[in-house]
């Protein structure tokens, strides 16, 4: 057995680990390095065609953003992840590809003027659209047999819709070992995400440690402050703009606003950035079925594309 670290080692993005066991090569996550020049992402430190399986803990781009590069460069294996992560990846990776294409187009306009060679995008929308062909979805808590001597279990990590920690049970040379990859672990008592679950034992644990030295405030401790700011601003005839991550944070923010009663009678307008699948925005429904310890108060009533919707439709 051999474990190699190709990302999120001495840094916080680009999660990518490779486990070699029983003649098979298994990736756990394949994320983009973010906040650096793209040269860090252009070359993969392994031959994609040599990878048999890729297990994705969740859809955030720093954990899944180089999956289209795998496929573009010869990956022929299978991608295993949860159903909701698969759904989110199909949207987010196409948006990422749209950004890659736009960035390359912008740079190439400058390259042409300067007489420099043109650059290719890391991957294209067409590359990202192929990803679902390679995905097999897994259910939380249900063992999945990958190959001889390798079994996996995904459990809810409470970080994002579909996020998971993964335990691999590995048998080789008459010995059986378990190794857990935590993925990003969420906080407890979040408004629209279930609390994280935890494995009770493992021989080895590969732990994400971003924010690991920080004590988070309780989610509802700041909603009263937010409600006060919103009400005071609206009372003066103003508008409140709240920059937010598009995935989860925005939904959680709207949930907190609704639960606090802020801006009663006023309807929030959510502005989406440009998307590779522009025509599909507003028609995508992603939901986790089953009982929730919290979040049951949420109701999705109407989603509409386009400019500010009439109040009667919200």
Regions from the PLM with identified roles:
Residues 1-49, 130-194, 284-289, 306-307:
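Core dinuclear metal-dependent hydrolase active-site scaffold
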Residues 3, 29, 58-59, 89, ...:
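Conserved structural-core and active-site-/substrate-pathway-adjacent residues in large, well-folded domains
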Residues 6, 82, 155, 182, ...:
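Generic beta-strand/beta-sheet core signal
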Residues 9-11, 21-77, 81-135, 185-194, ...:
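Pre-active-site segment of Zn-dependent metallo-hydrolases
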Residues 52, 203, 294:
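Conserved acidic residues
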Residues 96-160, 261-292:
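Metallo-beta-lactamase
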Residues 229-314:
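Hard-cation-handling environments
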């Amino acid at each position: 057995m051999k474990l190699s670290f190709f990302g999120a080692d001495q840094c916080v993005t680009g999660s990518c680990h490779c486990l070699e066991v029983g003649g098979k090569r298994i990736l756990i996550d394949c994320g983009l390095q973010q906040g650096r020049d793209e040269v860090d992402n252009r070359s993969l430190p392994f031959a994609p065609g040599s990878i048999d399986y890729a297990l994705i803990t969740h859809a955030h781009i720093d954990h899944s953003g180089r999956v289209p590069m795998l496929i573009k460069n010869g990956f022929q294996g299978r991608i295993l992840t949860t159903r909701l992560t698969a759904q989110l990846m199909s949207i987010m990776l196409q948006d990422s590809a749209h950004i890659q294409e736009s960035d390359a187009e912008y740079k190439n306009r400058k390259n042409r003027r300067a007489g420099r060679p043109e650059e290719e995008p890391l991957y294209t929308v067409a590359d990202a659209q192929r990803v679902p062909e390679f995905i097999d979805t897994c259910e939380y808590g249900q063992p999945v047999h990958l190959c001889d001597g390798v079994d996996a279990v995904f459990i809810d990590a409470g970080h994002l819709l579909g996020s998971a920690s993964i335990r691999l049970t590995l048998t080789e040379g008459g010995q059986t070992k378990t190794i857990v990859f935590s993925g990003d672990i969420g906080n407890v008592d979040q408004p629209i995400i279930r609390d994280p679950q935890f494995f009770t034992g493992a021989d080895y644990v590969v732990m994400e440690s971003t924010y690991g030295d920080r004590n988070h405030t309780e989610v509802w401790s700041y909603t009263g402050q937010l409600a006060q700011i919103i009400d005071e601003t609206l009372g003066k005839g103003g508008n409140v703009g709240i920059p937010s991550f598009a995935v989860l944070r925005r939904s959680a923010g709207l949930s907190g606003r609704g639960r606090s009663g802020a801006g009663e009678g006023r309807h929030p307008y959510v502005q989406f950035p440009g998307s590779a699948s522009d025509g599909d925005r507003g028609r995508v429904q992603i939901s986790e079925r089953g009982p929730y310890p919290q979040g049951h108060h949420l109701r999705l009533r109407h989603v509409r594309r386009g400019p500010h919707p009439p109040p009667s439709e919200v």
